[in-house]
Amino acid sequence: RDLRMSRGLGDVYKRQNYDFSTLFENVVWGNTQMFFPISLVMIGSWLIDRESTHDTLKNIMTIPVSMPKMLGAKLFWVGIFAVLLGIYSVGVTLITGLTVGLSGLTVEVFFHGGTQIVLAALTTYLVCMPLILIFGQIRGAYLGGSILAFFLGYSMLFFKGGILASIYPFSAALILVGFDMSGYAGTTTAPNPLLAVIGVGIMVLWAVLLLLMSSNKKEIKSRKQANSKGKGKRAVRRKGR
């Protein structure tokens, strides 16, 4: 039965002139629009949120690890995860296409489509870094961050032309990997790679600023902790007198 269903699905794809090239394009579009933003923001924010949930954030105050370094390390591993997720997506796409019997699989198609998927995972990660840092530092907000990432990714459909079609961060993530959005988002103007670089660059710069601001946050917490200890010692001395 499963074999017949697989063949039937393959026949449907063939009737719609579906081939491996089209399949790879659909995966790149779907990943950047929904799957990667939701997954990366949810998992990245969750990793940072563990420090607050497990009450281990206070340990940073006593060991020589700054808040920016801690957050930067977690962002780095989320980036590694994004690349691995892209490679995994390439494998699943290949297996799916072979299972349903799609045509058009060549070395060139596989290399081009697979490279676009992995690079799109990386550029989408760069765009999502500020969201990961913001919602990761708000206790229990990682689910809300993933929902916002979904809406931001889906909003690509509303920018059909002009500057916003190229500078909008999630659209820019696709433009930088050479993806043609005209057949998916209905864009009416040619993409501008320079604006795309600016769009992604703004998000990276925002993430850097958030990392720098996190050091001030740690200093404020340290001062509050020192002040509370000082007040406690003074109270003990008064009682002793």
Where in this protein do the model-derived segments appear?
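Structural signal for membrane-spanning alpha-helices in multi-pass inner-membrane proteins
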Residues: G44, L85, S89, T93, ...
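Secretory targeting signals
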Residues: R7, D11-F35, S39, G72-Q137, ...
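Intrinsically disordered, Lys/Arg-rich low-complexity segments
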Residues: S228-R241
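Transmembrane alpha-helical segments in integral membrane proteins
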Residues: P37-S52, L57, C128-L143, I202-K218
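Long, highly hydrophobic alpha-helical transmembrane signal-anchor segments
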Residues: D11-D19, S45, S52, N59
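Helix-loop-helix units of permease transmembrane domains in multi-pass membrane transporters
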Residues: L47-G79
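Hydrophobic alpha-helical membrane-insertion segments
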Residues: R1, M70, F76-S89, G145-G161
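Terminal transmembrane helical anchor/hairpin motif
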Residues: D11-F24, S146-K231
